């Protein structure tokens, strides 16, 4: 039982941390775009690359196979947050040239709830099995979920 949770964490953690690092890269692009330090075409190109890398993470999280039974529902919800974020990023990329951000999907609340639900289930299972979780896991679901074209 303990081993299956460790296997799961070993598979999910690099994805979670990679996504965090990747999304941290969106704010400097959007900031430079807002300040007119880069053109809309450059911002769109950079955000497009970021979105394509994110899409690869979405595939990876969906492909996680060794999910402990007690986490399966939470894992499906967590993986779905990647679908929502990818849809948001795709819409953001498309909106950049015309600076038309009014119709961006508003999925932050749904994503936050799913991520927090996943984190809570993970914490409960880890406590029951005596498994230590990564120290930064408490931050999951807090803070900004999606890069904001208007700034935070």
Provide a role label for each language-model segment.
Residues 53-79, 94-98, 127-133:
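Short, solvent-exposed, charged loop/turn and helix-capping segments
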Residues 1-50, 84-152:
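C-terminal amphipathic alpha-helix
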């Amino acid at each position: 039982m303990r081993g299956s949770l460790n296997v799961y964490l070993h598979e999910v953690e690099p994805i979670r941390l990679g996504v965090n690092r990747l999304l941290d890269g969106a704010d400097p692009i959007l900031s430079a775009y807002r300040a007119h330090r880069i053109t809309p075409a450059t911002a769109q190109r950079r955000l497009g690359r970021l979105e394509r890398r994110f899409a690869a993470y979405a595939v990876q999280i969906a492909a996680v196979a060794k999910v402990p039974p007690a986490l399966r529902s939470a894992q499906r919800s967590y993986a779905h947050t990647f679908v929502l974020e990818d849809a948001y990023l795709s819409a953001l990329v498309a909106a950049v040239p015309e600076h038309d951000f009014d119709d961006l999907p508003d999925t932050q609340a749904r994503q936050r709830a799913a991520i927090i639900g996943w984190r809570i289930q993970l914490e409960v299972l880890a406590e029951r099995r005596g498994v230590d979780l990564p120290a930064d896991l408490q931050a999951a679901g807090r803070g900004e979920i999606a890069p904001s074209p208007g700034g935070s």
